Structure formats: C-alpha cells, structure tokens
Amino acid sequence: ASGLRKKARKWDRVVKTGRTHLQDATPMRVGQEFSGFAAQIEYGTTRAERAMKRLAENLPIGGTAVGTGINTHAEFGRRVSASLKKRLRIGFAEATNHFEAQATRDCVVEASGELRTIAISLSKIANDIRWLGSGPRCGLGELVLPATQPGSSIMPGKVNPVICESVMQVTCQVMGHDLAISTGGLGGTGSLLQLNVAMPMMAWAMIDSIRLLANAASILQDKCIDGLELDRTVAEGYVERSLMMGTSLAPVIGYENAARLAKQAHASGLTIREMALELELLEPEMLATHLDPASMTEPDSGGSGKSGKTRGSTGRKGGGR
C-alpha cells in the first residue's frame, strides 16, 4: 500500500472525472482515487492478520484421536505449542476446544477467505489502472503505465499492461485455491464427524496463495505503480467536458433545470459552462464559483460552493468519498 499512498499524496490536487457504471460522474481528485486503492490493501491486510492470529492460536496438538486427549500428558499440547512459539516466533497456542479444532478447519477457511479478499482488491486495483491507462490515443489515457513489455507481434509500438494482467491472473488462482480450501472444510468432504482429513490439500493451497499474493503485490508495486505517470492535461480536460459538472448547479437552479441544461449541452456539443453562459442562467462570477471542479471534491460547507474540510488521501477523515 505504500506505493499507492505515495501516488495519492503526489496527485492529491489533480481533479479528474469520477466514473460510475462506466459513465461520467462528478469530479474527484486523483489522490482520493488512489487513497481508496491504498485503503483496500491496508484493510485487507489487517483482516488477514487477525484471521492468521486466530489460526495460529487454534492448534489441535494434544487432542489425539478424537479430541479427548487420551494417552497423552495433560500439558502436552500447551508445552508443544509454547515450544513452537519460541522457536518459530509465531503466536502459536493450543486450541481451547479440541473437538472443534480437530473435526473442522473453520479457521483455515476463514483465513483463506481473507486472502481471497486481498486478491479481489488487487484485481480491482490492477484492472482500474489498466482501464485508466488505456489508449494512448483512443482510450481514457489518464495514466501512463511503464513500458515493461513494449511492442506487439503484429502492431509496432503497442504497449500492453502486462503487469496488471498478470496480477489479475494470479488473483484468479488465489480465488481458485480459496474454493478448494472451502471445499476441504465442507462436512462430508473434508470435515466428517470427529476429524477433518483435508488439511494436506488445504495447507498447500493456503501456502501457495500467500506466495502468489506476496509476489504479485511486490511486482505490481515495483513494475507498475512506482513508475506510473499521470497525464494531467487529459485528466483535467475530461472534467471540463463532463456533463456531470452540472450536478453542482442543482442546488442553485433546481434538479430539473440542471438536467435540462445537461441535455442541451450534450445536444449542442457545448460544455456545461458554455451552455450556462449562453442561456444566462447565472452571473458569470457566480457560475465560476459553482463550477469550480476542486470545490466539488469535498462536502459543501454551507451552500457557498466552497468545500469543507479535506478528506480522503490526506487521511484526516478516513477514506475517499
């Protein structure tokens, strides 16, 4: 997440067009967008760490056959767990309920689910970057991705987003591992009566998921995010042309009038600003105040058209809106 946070700070004053349903939406800052990416990874990592802690603290050592601990010393599980904790420096602890710990692998399923969530976050981030870097002439073109594999077998000069696409493929594999682990925890498949028999497969899939995610995250940052560049001219140019600029006029001229203005601007090929000036809906000074893109990236501080306190990539009020 550090690379994403760095970009969020670097580009926090650049205003761009937000997009929902792949359609133009109201303005936002590039820094806010990247703060959302960073928060995804940070939240996912925190959730995974909590799940891994619960997994480490649920060792079924000492339960023997069915969880009763027959034919073993009463302190066997505690002592072995303590020894493992000391040698490996991992917070291992004996399970508090051996019947749950041996008959199921619910904590493994939970931990795998958190890894799947990280995979989904990485896939979303990689795909968004790929979309924002589409072009260079006929796509969105807001981001310029590092040319890690320039050229095409048939199209000279083409640069494909291969790092983003490789990360997306890795995340598919992690999600496949999660399905396998979930199946291993099912009653009648892995978990049956007093013993889960699928731990070899579940452990292998879990370890492979961790390896894949670690490598993918490292490569995404080193080979893509660190070298990302922003085409500020393109990003800010979209903002002025966006019909959603009229959203800020709705509280002033009414929703229906703002919608009518957007339709007229679209039909005439004019911007919202140009159309509003032509129709003389507001005085030029007032129009300039309400059509200030930067003020649209924050909550209104009382109808003045000026923004309130900064939130998003600065971290003062959490994630971006």
Kindly give the residue locations of the regions a language model identified:
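Conserved, well-structured ligand/cofactor-binding cores
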Residues: 1-321
